[in-house]
């Protein structure tokens, strides 16, 4: 019976994967081609469609097993993709590159969870007594929510670093139709204006990317702090000690230290924002380790 349900879940999740993939392709096409995509509502609709399927899968597991589905890596990845989808849907109208980042991340996560993760890791087993606690839902959901925010912020920081340091305006012109590419960061309209006005708009786009990255990471850092504290309380309640230095705890602490360093550099006006963005980009690698650990 369990194998049949897993096959059914895989079939349904194909729709979520395709929705995120189509959305990703449209958003990247909109950023990299001059002509405005007339069906701009389609990628956002695909994201919403994909998100509804993921939410349905989580709710189905919740009702079937009578607890919030965050007990294994598969369920955690589904929840992470749902969080990233929500963030993307909310903020894509403010900065269209968020649509490209968020939908691509969701596509990769769903693809990994359904096509690479071994079936044994997707099956749910009976929870250990220590996991039958309300702290499970609170701690894990807050941690994954924080990772979703930090992933989005770190990706934006990475783009900020690349655009400011590694690409000149001439090289960008060779890669993209420059007016459309930059203006699309801020608005969903193509522009033909060039020259000083365009350069000023480009700088505004850079600052918009960096500012949103800072806001995402700040909120994610607060959530991560709350998640670590709730996890410590849960550990003390279940096992009698607040910290045991297991891999999950260690990587969560490393993640906290990396983004604490980012915030320290970012707030200190003596440092250039580019250094803070480099640290945040490093945090993206750390999050990958802590998520898949």
UniProtKB/Swiss-Prot annotation:
One Gene Ontology term from the biological process aspect of the record: cytochrome complex assembly
Main localization, broad class: plastid
Chaperone as UniProt keyword: no
Annotated transmembrane regions: 12-32, 39-59, 78-98, 99-119, 142-162, 216-236, 250-267, 273-293
Keyword Membrane: yes
Subcellular location: Plastid, Chloroplast thylakoid membrane
Assigned keywords, A-Z: Chloroplast, Cytochrome c-type biogenesis, Membrane, Plastid, Thylakoid, Transmembrane, Transmembrane helix
GO cellular component entries: chloroplast thylakoid membrane; plasma membrane
Entry-linked InterPro entries: Cyt_c_assembly (IPR002541), Cyt_c_biogenesis_CcsA (IPR017562), Cyt_c_biogenesis_CcsA/CcmC (IPR045062)
Membrane topology recorded in Swiss-Prot or TrEMBL: Multi-pass membrane protein
GO molecular function: heme binding
Family matches, as Pfam families: Cytochrom_C_asm (PF01578)
Superkingdom, natural source: Eukaryota
Family from the record: Belongs to the CcmF/CycK/Ccl1/NrfE/CcsA family.
Subunit description: May interact with Ccs1.
Function per UniProt: Required during biogenesis of c-type cytochromes (cytochrome c6 and cytochrome f) at the step of heme attachment.
The protein's name: Cytochrome c biogenesis protein CcsA
Native species: Cyanidium caldarium (Red alga)
The organism's taxonomic lineage, starting at the top: Eukaryota, Rhodophyta, Bangiophyceae, Cyanidiales, Cyanidiaceae
């Amino acid at each position: 019976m369990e194998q049949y349900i897993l096959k059914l879940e895989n079939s349904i999740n194909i729709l979520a994967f395709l929705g995120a993939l189509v959305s990703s392709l449209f958003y990247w096409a909109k950023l990299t081609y001059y002509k405005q995509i007339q069906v701009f509502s389609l990628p956002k609709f695909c994201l919403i469609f994909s998100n509804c399927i993921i939410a349905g899968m989580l709710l189905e597991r919740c009702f079937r097993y009578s607890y919030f589905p965050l007990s294994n890596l598969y369920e955690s990845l589904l929840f992470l993709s749902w969080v990233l989808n929500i963030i993307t849907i909310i903020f894509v109208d403010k900065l269209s590159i968020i649509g490209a980042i968020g939908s691509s991340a969701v596509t990769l996560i769903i693809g990994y969870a359904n096509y690479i993760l071994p079936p044994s890791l997707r099956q749910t087993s009976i929870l250990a007594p220590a996991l039958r606690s309300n702290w499970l839902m609170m701690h894990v959901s807050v941690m994954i929510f924080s990772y979703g925010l930090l992933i989005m912020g770190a990706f934006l920081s990475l783009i900020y670093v690349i655009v400011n340091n590694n690409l000149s305006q001439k090289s960008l012109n060779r890669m993209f139709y420059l007016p459309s590419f930059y203006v699309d960061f801020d608005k969903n309209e193509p522009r033909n204006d060039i020259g000083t006005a365009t350069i000023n708009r480009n700088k505004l786009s850079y600052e918009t990317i960096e500012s949103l990255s800072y806001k995402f990471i700040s909120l994610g850092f607060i959530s991560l702090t709350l998640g670590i504290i709730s996890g410590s309380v849960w550990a003390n309640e279940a096992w009698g000690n607040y910290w045991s230095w297991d891999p999950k705890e260690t990587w969560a602490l490393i993640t906290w230290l990396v983004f604490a360093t980012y915030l320290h550099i970012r707030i200190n006006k003596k440092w250039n924002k580019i250094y803070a963005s480099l640290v945040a980009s490093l945090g993206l690698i750390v999050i990958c380790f802590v998520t898949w650990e």
